[in-house]
């Protein structure tokens, strides 16, 4: 009997409140049920090192796919998004978007795509400059150390929150639980709509 493909996709970090979703218990639960787990680390990517495998503790504690946005990191403006996947998921012989660099052999009657995964799934001219920026930004983060970055972020976050909470016309969209969070936050500004309309006319 055919088993349907089940995919669970979750945010690692909320881009509104900064709350962090725990990966390990969810990875294990999803894999116990025979599904795939994909993590959207677009917000988390600039705050922590991506962790694809934590199998030393539990063999089910791994990500099937992870994607994030390096352009949110210092120095990586203009860099392409990154998709990291397990090799076992690349099952198609035809690339998702055939283009230059994906063809291995062509004749009048047939064609064959390359078996090199990174070439087969990246048709056309790559964003070379963006990829270099991404690599340099990741190198910088690794050089500084993720622990150091998180400590500095926490200092700046607390200083910022202290000032914002004192302002009468600023509402912080935050969760008052003790859940772990990053230095991401969102605010609303109290301002009467009628006044805006009058000032715009």
Spans of features found by a protein language model:
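Pyridoxal 5′-phosphate
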Residues: 1-201
């Amino acid at each position: 009997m055919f088993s349907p493909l089940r995919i669970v996709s979750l945010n690692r970090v909320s881009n509104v409140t900064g709350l962090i979703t725990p990966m390990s218990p969810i990875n294990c639960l999803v894999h116990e049920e025979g599904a795939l787990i994909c993590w959207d680390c677009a917000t988390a990517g600039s705050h922590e090192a991506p962790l694809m495998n934590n199998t030393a503790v539990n063999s089910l504690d791994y990500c099937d796919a992870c994607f994030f946005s390096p352009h949110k990191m210092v120095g990586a403006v203009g860099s392409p998004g990154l998709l990291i996947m397990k090799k076992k998921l690349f099952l198609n012989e035809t690339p998702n978007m055939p283009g230059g660099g994906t063809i291995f052999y062509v004749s009048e009657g047939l064609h064959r795509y390359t078996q090199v995964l990174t070439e087969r799934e990246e048709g056309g001219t790559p964003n070379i400059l963006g990829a270099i920026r991404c690599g340099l930004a990741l190198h910088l983060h690794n050089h500084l150390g993720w622990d150091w970055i998180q400590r500095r972020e926490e200092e700046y976050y607390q200083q910022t929150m202290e000032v914002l909470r004192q302002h009468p016309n600023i509402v912080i969209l935050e969760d008052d639980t003790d859940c772990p969070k990053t230095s991401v936050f969102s605010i609303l500004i109290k301002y009467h709509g009628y006044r805006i309309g009058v000032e715009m006319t």
